[in-house]
Amino acid sequence: MPVVTMRQLLNSGVHFGHQTRRWNPKMKRFILTERNGIYIIDLQQSLSYIDRAYEFVKATVAHGGTVLFVGTKKQAQEAIAEQSTRVGQPYVNHRWLGGMLTNFQTVAKRIQRMKELEEINFEDVASSGHTKKELLLLKRELTKLEGNLGGIRNLNKVPSTIWIVDTKKEHLAIDEAKKLNIPVVAILDTNCDPDEVDFPIPGNDDAIRSVNLLTRVIADAVAEGLIARNAKATGSAEGTAAEPLAEWERELLESSNTEAPVAETAAAEAPVADAAIEAPVAEEAKTTEADDTK
């Protein structure tokens, strides 16, 4: 069954690019047409690239890899945190700190500092060993660290791959990933450079619904990879009891079983070749989201 349907892409406004005056000529091959001054992305190509990225992420996680979810723009923050947490992966959704990958040892020390501050009882001044002023300063430090590093608190080494929403905004993350040869999976809007991304997904990186859908697809790929990893580990442990699953892993297994009939129903929807231009729902999305964000 397909990872996502054409109708889902249309309803989420994935096909809306930027205004024609704001584009990267390298993206020409991914553009279907132009409508009312806005480029329309070829969703047939998007479907193929989604499948390719999905299989890569799934295989990476199945072999023990980790996916770092990155998206600091307002439209992506909630989806990045929600979907990465759902599958137990690290994320950055507020600010990318320079050297987060290339200087990971220093970042790891800051994470350890954050965990040490979390052990302090800020409500009990007497037993804390600090004055009220010191506790206030330490609390501020903790709040700042949690905002910047809270999403990667359990990241013990550089990730195996990175999922990025808006490659232009997250150019620092792209640069660091390239230096370390970390594969990048990302949404490519019509103003992006496809040469910067290893596994591109042509689509709208500004509309909230588009970002939510594509980020969920990547999280689903992670979930399948985790299930495959666990199945492989269980199968290789002959004669021994299977290691208990974490609570969130059990939920993934249960949801994958219960959602299968729904997914099959969605898969039955016939793709519409020219719907990227003619669908009324898509045109409404253009008015409400694309024009405001582009």
From Swiss-Prot:
Instruction: Please verify whether the record's keywords include Ribonucleoprotein.
Output: yes
Q: A Gene Ontology MF term for this entry?
A: structural constituent of ribosome
Coiled-coil-forming residues are none
Q: Where is the composition biased (Low complexity)?
A: 259-282
Give the protein name, as stated in the record: Small ribosomal subunit protein uS2
Q: Which domain of life is it from?
A: Bacteria
Spell out the SUPFAM superfamilies in the cross-references: Ribosomal protein S2
Q: What is a single cellular component term in the Gene Ontology annotation?
A: cytosolic small ribosomal subunit
Q: Oxidoreductase among the record's keywords? A: no
- Provide the residue span(s) of the region labelled Disordered: 254-294
Q: Which family does it belong to?
A: Belongs to the universal ribosomal protein uS2 family.
Primary gene name: rpsB
Keywords of this protein's UniProt record, alphabetized? Ribonucleoprotein, Ribosomal protein
Extract one GO BP annotation from the record: translation
Q: Which PROSITE patterns match?
A: RIBOSOMAL_S2_1
Q: Where is the composition biased (Basic and acidic residues)?
A: 283-294
* Pfam families recorded: Ribosomal_S2
